[in-house]
UniProtKB/Swiss-Prot annotation:
A GO CC term assigned to this protein in UniProt: cytosol
Source organism of this protein record: Polynucleobacter asymbioticus (strain DSM 18221 / CIP 109841 / QLW-P1DMWA-1)
Gene3D superfamilies reported for this sequence: P-loop containing nucleotide triphosphate hydrolases
Family label: Belongs to the TRAFAC class TrmE-Era-EngA-EngB-Septin-like GTPase superfamily. EngB GTPase family.
Physiological role: Necessary for normal cell division and for the maintenance of normal septation.
Chain sites annotated for binding Mg(2+): S38, T60
Gene: engB
Top-level taxon: Bacteria
GO biological process, any: division septum assembly
NCBIfam families: GTPase_YsxC (TIGR03598)
The protein's name in its UniProt record: Probable GTP-binding protein EngB
An example molecular function term from Gene Ontology annotations: GTP binding
Amino acid sequence: MSKLFQARFATTVNDTHCLPATPLREVAFAGRSNAGKSSALNVLCNQKRLAFASKTPGRTQHINYFGIFAKDDLLAYLVDLPGYGYAAVNHETKYHWNALLSDYLQEREQLVGMVLIVDARRGITELDEQMIQWFVPTGKPIHILLSKCDKLNKSECKHALEDVRKQLQQYDPALPDGTGESQQLTAQLFSSTKRIGLEEADNLIIKWLFEAETHEDEITS
């Protein structure tokens, strides 16, 4: 059983000054409104309504923290960031979201990686690129889940994944000529509905959150 199955709601904040004052590792989930972020969180944690998928895009305006527990011991956090890209949101709200997201992604020391949910049918959008550009300078990993891949046929899935991986090369400072396989920015196919790619995503998130712990266990054994 995955450690993510033990996730439960911890807190919600609307300002970076209110973020939990703990040294625990965090993995952030980001994505456009309606890209399938809440569904991805729910299926990865094997829960139906851990993250609330609003029928009104852009409604979630806070950073939601979900703690991963072992009985009553808090081990780490999954962090649900506000969805972005919904046109009906007013300018003031958009400005607040941008400031909140950029500050969190660029300055949060406890953040060890970002899972970016991208609709496989749309590919990486300009706003997705903005998220990547905010986060890449930290040197921390970004993993893209190409969601709703069940809506594409096998050939379309292959091309969608190839296109995104090629696009990611240009953002990796370790690949100055824009070629080669990026280690910092990775991508996979994913479907919450058909449960495609769950194991791959789960393994990576667990690695980010508990890699040091696993290494220490190997040393002591």
